[in-house]
């Protein structure tokens, strides 16, 4: 049980991006997440999750593959998903009660469970560097980014 209005799950985060995420939830988003421009070389990295959005900012799909397919170079607009989620509490309760879905099992991406179950995910486009900790290599790089004081 919780008396919170929103729940956010993240290990290392830029506070401006967090503020944007919370604003989206306060504006009525059931679930929200953050994306940023994909850096060169990340297209083929399966540990770098990509997201494609509708014109209204809702996620259409997340994948470990390079999406969308870039037919015309220079027009990619590929987005890297930053693994933070904000939930309205009722949405979080619903989400955690759902069984894993076929696409979720295929890609090993839990956010696909939300999309397959009809839960819209608002995607906030943020700028700047985000340092995720998703793999042992990411963890090894952490001290270089945040040295002890």
Specify the residue positions occupied by each region the protein language model found.
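Short beta-strand-to-loop acidic/aromatic patch adjacent to the donor-nucleotide binding site
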Residues: 1-12
């Amino acid at each position: 049980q919780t008396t919170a209005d929103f729940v956010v799950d993240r290990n290392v985060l830029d506070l401006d991006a967090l503020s944007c995420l919370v604003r989206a939830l306060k504006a009525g988003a059931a679930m929200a997440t953050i994306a940023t421009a994909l850096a060169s070389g990340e297209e083929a990295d399966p540990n770098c999750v990509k997201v494609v959005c509708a014109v209204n900012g809702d996620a259409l799909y997340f994948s470990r593959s390079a999406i969308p397919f870039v037919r015309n170079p220079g027009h990619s607009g590929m987005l890297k998903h930053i693994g933070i989620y904000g939930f309205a509490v009722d949405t979080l309760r619903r989400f955690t009660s759902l069984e894993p879905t076929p696409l979720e099992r295929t890609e090993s991406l839990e956010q696909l469970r939300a999309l397959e179950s009809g839960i819209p995910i608002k995607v906030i486009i943020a700028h700047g560097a985000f340092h995720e900790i998703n793999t042992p290599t990411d963890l090894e790089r952490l001290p270089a980014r945040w040295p002890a004081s």
